Amino acid sequence: MAERANDIRPGQVLEHNGGLFLVVSIMHTQPGKGGAYIQAEMKNIKTGAKLYERFRSDATIRRAILDEEEYIYLFTEGNIVNLMHPSNYEQITINLDLLEEKKIYLQDNMRIKVVTYQDKIIFAHVPDYVRLTVKETESFIKGQTITSSYKPAVLENGMRINVPQFIKEEDKIVVYTPDDSYYERVKE
């Protein structure tokens, strides 16, 4: 789909120079002399190589038309992830590398979004919010601080994050997966 370069947003996938590129970040620039332009940091989906490209604001770019479907995570066997479609029960397998560093969040029956381009799987996403149990953390000492502060914690999947002082071992928390940060304590 053809669009103006001014409409590029992070997270979009572009067809550029014969390949597919994920837009990582953009910066609009209006120099004192000359026309405005967009500086885009992009990642080649196939190779993972970064590309920094400059587009004139009025240039035409091609956004890739992607299909996105939700699947249910079943199990992982080696480097292969087995997923099932929730309505027709069709099972597919994807390479674990498609999840990149987010594979640590995989849990039974988790909903995984699989993105395809021309019937070829290009990447997969875990949900933005995942519930996990705190396995280890330091105890809270009342009056320890007057400002909000965080302490390290180890979660059930082995991941280490910073959590607020009031979180105890065995508490269930929600983690925001895009930046691997504490979001909230689960209210039961």
From Swiss-Prot:
It is found in: Cytoplasm. GO terms for molecular function: translation elongation factor activity. It comes from the Bacteria. Coiled coil: none annotated. The keyword Iron-sulfur does not apply. Keywords: Cytoplasm, Elongation factor, Protein biosynthesis. One of its GO terms (cellular component) is cytoplasm. Its main location: cytoplasm. Involved in peptide bond synthesis. Stimulates efficient translation and peptide-bond synthesis on native or reconstituted 70S ribosomes in vitro. Probably functions indirectly by altering the affinity of the ribosome for aminoacyl-tRNA, thus increasing their reactivity as acceptors for peptidyl transferase. Belongs to the elongation factor P family. This is Elongation factor P. It comes from Wolbachia sp. subsp. Brugia malayi (strain TRS). The gene is efp.
